[in-house]
Structure formats: structure tokens, C-alpha cells
Amino acid sequence: MNRILRISETHPLTWRLRDDQKTVWIKEYCDKNGYLSLKKALKEMLPEDVINIVKESGLKGRGGAGFSTGLKWSLMSQNHSYTRERGYLICNADEMEPGTYKDRLLIEKIPHQLIEGIILSAYALNVSRAYIFLRGEYVQAEHILKQSIQEAINFGFIGLNILGSNFNIELVLHTGAGRYICGEETALINSLEGRRANPRSKPPFPAVFGLWGKPTCVNNVETLSNVPCIILNGVSWYKNLSKSSDTGTKLMGFSGNVRNPGVWELPFGTTAREILEDYAHGMKSGFSLKAWQPGGAGTDFLLEEHLDLPMDFKNISQAGSRLGTALSMAVDNKTSMVSLVYNIEKFFSRESCGLCTPCRDGLPWIVKILKSLEQNKGHKNDVKNLEKLCSHLSPGKTFCAHAPGAIEPLQSAIKYFRSEFESGINIRKRDLNKKIIGIQSNCI
């Protein structure tokens, strides 16, 4: 996190960050208004009041989908089976999207903000057990969370009869086994149950039939970290933070060959050009911007002409991409789009769960074709075949959203840089095809 002026009124997620980059432990967190939201909710509010405030605030999921958090909570609380047996809350901290590191920042530097958000959300959902599903490679984050959870227990924020409210909460930390597909909520639930991490068929949705058959809500780290400030400061304040129809702030960033790569908390509606030039300080000397991805490896490429778009769910979608995690990657003029997309598709192919045939067989086929094009050994119809494969991996034709997300960068790269892919067709084979066509025409 690069140093910028941060205050609680404008940077609710990051104002507590220390300049020395050390972790904010519970005593310091409490000195900076920590757990005041929890005390307010438990003493002054009913669970449904918390849900209504979060719904009115317009908070959307920060994991990439952008679904209304309050509505998601309402679906769980209104479920009939929910009234008979309690369910579970799961914090999705399995951050494995290439180029994304925002959740790691929140976990390692301000862990109690996340923990407070989890406890508040559990209270709103009337659940007594919550889980943090953490990426297995985040070893330092695991140690920090274990210590922070124990601190919260020692201070009486986790356990039985929290703050004399008759509300009980148990928080369990679970580390994953390195599967990207666990970012999908039902695959995560299967993994947490000890099963193979395959997505489930929906419906039933987790809000009805989730972890161990109980109603379950899965929320992202950044989403849950927003809850305390909303409860403490109110709906109007939260909405006024934004410059867009999407409310609040968002962790945004730029990586690639930029002078100052990083992540910053900025209002929704900040343009990509502002982030690139004012915060990332532009491209490195000798490089110019060729393309950029708005929010992770699984989002469509955009061009320099799109930099003036406000970074929010609606505007990025209208431009033909997705906001995703809002951590953008700059592609410089010296990068081969074929090589870049080849590496991206190799990742997605390797991370396929293998459950459905289009994804299991289609992605490796795409990788094989891209490898040939990268080595200038491509065949005449390779680019067309890539487009055909993409049509078979589009939304609605696979079991989950893994393959449709995987083909987004490929489709957009072909759309904007088709000549680079066509240049990978073997020249010798092209000349041979021309000769064959010439011979055939002479024979007619």
C-alpha cells in the first residue's frame, strides 16, 4: 500500500494502516474506534436492523460479482429452513486471481477490521459459527489471523454471551489446498466439507442448502471489512463516499510495467487514467500502454481509449469487460499478446476442476493452439478455431463460470490484436497453401 493521506472520513478501510507496514493488533485497533460498531449493534440493533442498513447502503460484493450484500443476506434470513436451524457464514479469503492482492493487505495489516466485520455479519444472519477459508499459500496471513482470533477471544469479542448480549460466535480458520476453483462459493463449500473442490449445481443456492446442508452465506474479505464502518457511520455517509452509482470505496490498483505499482483505497467512479497516472505514476521509461485488464486475469482487455472510464461495475461492463477485483494490469507495447494470453490460458486450464467436458477438454485445446501460434507453427484456421472454441465455452454451456471467465482475455485479445495471432501461422505452410491453390486453379 503506497503512502497517501488517509483519514477515517474518506478511507474507511485503510485509514488505520501503519506507515511502517506493521500489523495493527487489537489494542491499537480498539484505540482507533475498533469494535465500536460491534458494541453499537449488539446494544442498540436487532439482526434485521443490521441487514436493512447494509442493504440500504448499497454495499456490493467486492469479490468480483458485484451482487448486493444486503439482498444476499436477506435471501438467507428469509429462507424457511433458516427459521428451524441455524446456518453458517463463510469468509472467502481464497485469493488466487493472478494480479490480485487486495485481501492479503487487509488480512495481514488490519486483521481485526475483518474479524469485526465477520462477527457483525454473523450477528445479522443469526449464525453462531463462522469460517475463514484462507488461501493455503498465505502463510504469514495464517499466523496473523490465528493470533488475532485469539486476541479477540481474550478481549471477549468471540465466544459465549458476547458483551452480555446472549449472542455466541465461534470463528474457525481453515486453509485451502491450492485450488483456484475454490473461489467459486459452492466449490469452496465442498472443499470445507472435505470433498473434492467441484462446483455444485444451482439451485439450490447456498442460502438454502450450503455447508453440511445448512443455509450458508459466503462473502469476500473486502466485503465483510466494509460492514463495521457502515454500521458506525450510517448509510448517507457511506453513499457520499462514492462518485458513482456504486456506493462506498474500493481497493483499486495497477501492476505491470508501471513506475509505482500498488493498491489504493479510492472512491467508486475514479477513472482508470487517474489510477494509472496519479497513483501508479504512469508507465516506466521506454514503455507505453498497449492494453489493460480492469480486474484480474479473467477479465477482458481494454485499450488506452478506455482509460477515462469510471471504475465501477456499470461503466466497465458497458465497455465490454468486468470490474472484477479492480486491480488492473497494464500491458506494455513490448509484450506479445499471444504469449501473454498463452500464459493466462495455461493457468486457467491447469485450474479447471475437470467436472464438465467443455472446460476439461476445451481449455487444454486452446492452450495447444496458442502454443503453436506463439512458436510460429500455427495452422491456417487456428484463429478461427480459437473463436469456435470460445463459443463452446460461453456462459450457459459449462457447469460454472470458470471457463467463461477464462476465455474473456482470449476473446478480447483476438478482437483488438487479431494480426498478432494471425502472424503466428507458419509462413512456410501459408506459402505451401498458396502454391497448392495455384496448382489447383491451373488444373481447372
Swiss-Prot record:
Cofactor(s) required, per the database record: FMN; [4Fe-4S] cluster
Gene3D superfamilies recorded: 3.10.20.600, 6.10.250.1450, NADH-ubiquinone oxidoreductase 51kDa subunit (3.40.50.11540), NADH-ubiquinone oxidoreductase 51kDa subunit, iron-sulphur binding domain (1.20.1440.230)
E.C. numbers: 7.1.1.-
Residues noted as binding [4Fe-4S] cluster in the record, renumbered to the chain: 353, 356, 359, 400
Family statement drawn from the similarity comment of this UniProt entry: Belongs to the complex I 51 kDa subunit family.
Coiled-coil region(s): none
Catalytic activity: a quinone + NADH + 5 H(+)(in) = a quinol + NAD(+) + 4 H(+)(out)
Self-association and partners: Composed of 13 different subunits. Subunits NuoCD, E, F, and G constitute the peripheral sector of the complex.
Sorted UniProt keywords: 4Fe-4S, Flavoprotein, FMN, Iron, Iron-sulfur, Metal-binding, NAD, Quinone, Translocase
SUPFAM superfamilies: Nqo1 FMN-binding domain-like, Nqo1 middle domain-like, Nqo1C-terminal domain-like
GO molecular function terms attached to this record: 4 iron, 4 sulfur cluster binding; FMN binding; metal ion binding; NAD binding; NADH dehydrogenase (ubiquinone) activity; quinone binding
Record NCBIfam families: nuoF_fam, PRK11278.1, PRK13596.1
Name of protein: NADH-quinone oxidoreductase subunit F
Function comment: NDH-1 shuttles electrons from NADH, via FMN and iron-sulfur (Fe-S) centers, to quinones in the respiratory chain. Couples the redox reaction to proton translocation (for every two electrons transferred, four hydrogen ions are translocated across the cytoplasmic membrane), and thus conserves the redox energy in a proton gradient.
Highest taxon of the lineage: Bacteria
